[in-house]
């Protein structure tokens, strides 16, 4: 599956334990914020990247909770070197 650089960056943060918090208005998602595991805000996660990840089913939300990486997303994320 083709995954853009921005999608890959967001997926990598989610794979390490991050999450995407969303705000709804009239049943539609109007605002998103992507947080790393340490609690920092990731500025690379835009609404367009979020919609692409949802369309490809690489992220999922269960019962209104924040969006996290799905099993399909874990399979498609490429490994990256960490400082840890």
From Swiss-Prot:
UniProt-listed InterPro entries: YjhX_toxin (IPR018654)
Coiled coil, from the record: none
Family the UniProt entry places it in: Belongs to the UPF0386 family.
Protein name as catalogued: UPF0386 protein Oant_1614
Record organism: Brucella anthropi (strain ATCC 49188 / DSM 6882 / CCUG 24695 / JCM 21032 / LMG 3331 / NBRC 15819 / NCTC 12168 / Alc 37)
